[in-house]
Every structure is written in C-alpha cells, then in structure tokens.
Amino acid sequence: MKSFIVGLVSAVAVSSVLARDNIQIAGSSTVLPFASIVAEEFGNSFSQFKTPIVGSGGSSGGIRQFCQGTGANTIDIANSSRKIKDKELKACAEKGVKNVIEVKIGYDGIVFASRRDSNKFELTTDHIAAAAKGNAKTWNEIDPKLPKQEIMLIIPASNHGTREVFEHKALGCKKECPLRQDGRIIEIAGDYTETLSKLNIDKNAVGVFGLSFYDSNRDKLQVATVNGVTPSAKTIETGEYPISRPLYFYIKGEHVGVIPGIKEYAQFFLSDMTSGNGSPLDKAGLVPLNDSERKEQLAKLK
C-alpha cells in the first residue's frame, strides 16, 4: 500500500509538470535582453515549441525561484550574472532540485556611466572604492584630477548578481562590504531602466550598468574609463578591462524531457549563429565565448 501511495504521488508530480508546455525563465537583468532575443528567435524557428516566457527579478531572485522545487509552478531556467553559490545549491537540493546544469553563455563588463552633458571620468578601482565606502562629498576630494562634482552613485541592490561582482571587483570586498549610509548611494532593486531614469533626474549621478545596456543607450550616456581602459567587447575579451564577468543560465535537470524544448532552447542559445561572433547577441552586446568554451558548454547538453 505504501509503495502504491509513493507511486501515486510521483505520478501526480510529473503530471503537474506536464500540464505546462512552455519554458519559464527568470533572473538576471543583465541576461534578460539576451534571453528575450533568444526566446523570440527560438519561438520563430521551432514551430513545435511555444515561445519561452522570460522574466527578470535579478540573479539572486531568479535562483531563489529556481530553487523552490520542481513542478509546473516552478521555473525551468534561472539567468544569472554570477555563479550559483554552494548555499543556493544546498537550498535547491532540499527542495528536490538536485540536477542543476550550469551553462556559461558569454561575458559582460560592469561600467560606470553618466549623462552625456555631465563631466567625463577617468576612474580607478581605488577611486570607486573611496567613493562607495568613504566620506568624501565630491570626486575631487578623492583625487584632485577628478571633477569637482557631488558624489552620487546609483548601484544595483543586493538581489542583482551585478552587485556582487561590483563589490568584489570594483570595491575589493571579499565577504561583507559596508557602504556609506549618508544618502550618496542609491540602491536599485529594479532593472537598468530604473537606474537610467535616476541619471536623467540628477546630473551628478554615476550609474553602474552592464556594458550591453550602456551600448544600447550610447545616445544618452557616456562611460568612464577604469584603470585607464575603456570598456568594450574587445577589452573585456582580452581581459584588459578590470571589471568583467561571465554570464550564465542554470537549467533544472528534473524538467529536461518533461517541459518541451528546454534542451533545444539551450542548444539554440549556445549555437554560433545565435551567440557567436557577428550573431544577434554579439550585436546586442554579449561578448561571445571562444570556440573551445562553446564546445565545452554544448557538451553539457548532450
């Protein structure tokens, strides 16, 4: 009798997953525009599958949703601008998500941008750390070579993977990262469009963005150099630009073969025509994987 009940519960769980026939994705605001392009192209190219639904919510928020369990009411893929943490994998496993497939999709840089009618900045990581953690009121108090301009930093909130990379690579924080609390830092829980609106309001504001978002808004923004390097696809690819990071999505292995099209979507995303040199994602600002990296990631999906 006990084995019958266990089998019945398993059958109900599987059938509830089968009740949904479209891929559901959430997570990183940085990955969002890339995933949206791929989802639309995937829907157009594969008539047998429905167009995936892509949402945002930040890397941490997406992974949190991803780890809520398996079934039709949970997402299939989490986009992330950082690697998943061990504690998140543990949380996933506790909810039955034990087969987490990590897929690296390319690279992006974190840039510091301001309005085009504002001062130009030539920053170092030390300048950025002093502005975020110190008590200077103007940039030239940190370094006389910097503009005499009020410090106002618009940064991603803690639900974004960009925030963690910013703290680690720009501010030099290893674990805890106490920031100034005097109103000169504004944290944005929403996406980059919200950061952009803050810059539109305040000429002094310097915003933290992904390179791809800046590339899409060059008519409105100017970008700072960091350690003497201008952020670009080339300087990120070569490693010259100091604040860059790989981008990922995470697949719920338990849903592969149950929710239609997950494997095909991932392979389509990683295909050279979708995310390689000269591809739609390359043109949208994603720095492509090299050939060996692409081959390695595709091997995970066989």
Regions found by a protein language model. Name each.
Residues 19-302:
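Exported/periplasmic ABC-transporter solute-binding proteins
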Residues 1-8:
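Sec-dependent signal peptide recognition
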Residues 8-11, 292:
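N-terminal low-complexity, Ser/Thr/acidic repeat segments characteristic of secreted
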